[in-house]
Amino acid sequence: VFRLAAIIALSFALHPACAAEARIIVQQSPLAGFQYYDGKVLWDNMRVGDALTLVREPQNPHDSNAVRVEWKGQPLGYVPRRDNRDVARQMDRGVAAQARIVNLKDARNPWQRVEFEIFVELAVARP
């Protein structure tokens, strides 16, 4: 998916006068590690659609592909290890991956509380 996004972005970068914005969703995941951060304190202020910040942590001692997820500067957790490899590689290559909350569920299981999507903004041709 990231390769396709890069090809599309490059083709429109050559013709900026014909460009508009589009979003390609790269993946949708549950938030890992929510129970270890201040999510409980922030919960009442979080909303579906809120922007999240992705922070690459290549020196993380537990996972060299770690990507931390933050809400308004506050750490919430991580992209799950099983889903982070491609995102980490693309971030390391300079791809500006973005994220937002797509589901909030008041569940006992912390893996079910926050679901988010990672996307890339692209330029697309105008008709």
State where each predicted segment sits.
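Conserved active-site motif detector
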Residues: F2-S11, A17-P127
